Regions:
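Conserved donor-binding/catalytic core segment of Leloir-type glycosyltransferases
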Residues: 133, 194, 198, 227-242, ...
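Short alpha-helical donor nucleotide-sugar binding micro-motif in glycosyltransferases
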Residues: 290, 298-303
Length: 395
């Protein structure tokens, strides 16, 4: 079975799945096609993997994308999708949410955007071999809203439907009993969706069967880390959408009644503002330079809690999976794709609500394992679902 993946960059959040597929299918049957070279700053931190023989630089006209028995694409390429549909070939289109703030749903009123979205919805409605893989429940709701609107349900101009879903890669999405947006076109649309995300490298230091390690876990210093108190970690670019100020305030206020510290690794335009906020709390918050990707996991093993504080701009947030792999307690926002999809509601707070985050840090947090959200599980789902397409002779 010839399988191709089409994306914009070579990402460390996509390569684990790529390698899992190569292991299952063989290198001769798999191609990873990317459109852009990685920017130098990210390349220096470990992004990029052009050395793999199955990685190709190209565009939507690259021959292997149409030759593949199965294509998974993170690029919106309706011309390619329609061509493959006419030839009866299986295509999975995956994306983060369609209507990120602040523009949000207003994007649908841009003529070119509306036309592109209508073509995608038409493929979902009319082609049995075209599927949508939403990167999180917010992306699924956005697509369901589009489907309802394109099928004449004008209520979808004002709200997105609430959906239920199976919490696993390839999990089904359900719209039964949903009243929002009526039912015109929504049920048919979600029947062609399967839950998706980014899948990270499995931890080499996972102890026992962490996948089964569920239950209430009071946040405290991990003895194996060799420190007292609670160490909170945040890693990334210091951007406004990341809402790192929320963590600083929550940890700072917590520090008045318990031993807790916050380590921030990264730089960005918000750095000066964040340091001013942190200065109010003495040495509770420490800032560090960015570190390469392969060192982030080591930091996670030295800390107790990871907080994903991003607002709705965060389409996914693969760091949630990385932290779970390393056995950390993880708290995230309702607005970010990964936390809303993977974490239990007891571990969630709304972006910017530092008081709720403080409450979570002071109380009990459900410590969960990565569960089925692994590259191996995702690869097995894809190959199992598409096995009937037949086997090719390689590229």
């Amino acid at each position: 079975m010839k399988f191709a993946f089409f994306t914009n960059i070579i990402s460390p959040h996509q390569m684990p799945l790529a390698r899992a597929l190569v292991e299952l299918l063989g290198a001769d049957e798999y191609r990873y096609v990317y459109t852009e070279a990685e920017e130098k700053g990210r390349a220096d931190l470990g992004w990029g993997n052009e050395g793999e023989d199955w990685c190709l630089h190209g565009d939507e006209n690259t021959a292997v994308l149409n030759e593949a028995d199965v294509l998974m694409s993170g690029v919106r390429a309706p011309n390619l999708f329609e061509k493959r549909a006419k030839e009866g070939k299986t295509t999975f289109y995956c994306s983060e949410r369609w209507f990120k703030p602040p523009i949000g749903f207003l994007r649908v009123f841009v003529p070119s955007y509306f036309k592109m979205a209508r073509r995608i919805v038409k493929l979902l409605n009319e082609n049995e071999n075209f599927y949508y893989l939403p990167m999180g429940i917010h992306a699924a709701r956005d697509m369901a809203r589009l489907c309802g609107l394109m099928n004449g349900d004008w209520k979808c101009l004002f709200r997105a439907p609430k959906l239920d879903f199976e919490r696993k890669p390839g999990g089904k999405v359900f719209s039964e009993g949903v009243k929002e947006c009526g039912s015109v076109g929504v049920g048919e649309c979600v029947g062609k969706m399967r839950m998706w995300g980014y899948f990270v490298q499995s931890s080499e230091f996972r102890v026992g069967s962490l996948e089964l390690n569920h239950g209430i876990h009071r946040i405290h210093g991990r003895k194996e880390c060799g420190h007292e108190g609670v160490k909170v970690l945040w890693v990334g670019r210091l951007l406004k959408i990341k809402r790192v100020d929320t963590i600083i305030k929550a940890v700072g206020e917590c520090s008045k009644s318990k031993k807790i510290t916050l380590d921030i690794y990264g730089v960005g335009p918000e750095e000066g503002k964040l340091k001013k906020i942190a200065a109010k709390y003495g040495d509770v918050v420490k800032f560090h330079p960015p570190v390469p990707i392969n060192e982030v996991r080591k930091l996670m093993r030295e800390h107790d809690v990871y907080v994903l504080s991003s607002n709705g701009y965060e389409g996914w947030g693969a760091v949630v999976s990385e932290a779970l792999e390393e056995g950390m307690a993880v708290i995230g926002t309702y607005e970010a794709g990964s936390s809303a999809t993977i974490l239990p509601e007891s571990n969630l707070f709304h972006a910017g609500d530092w008081r709720k985050l403080k409450e979570l840090l002071e109380g009990d947090v459900e410590r969960v394992g990565i569960g089925p959200w692994t590259a191996k599980s995702a690869a097995e789902f894809l190959t199992g679902l598409t096995r009937l397409t037949g086997l090719g002779n390689g590229y």
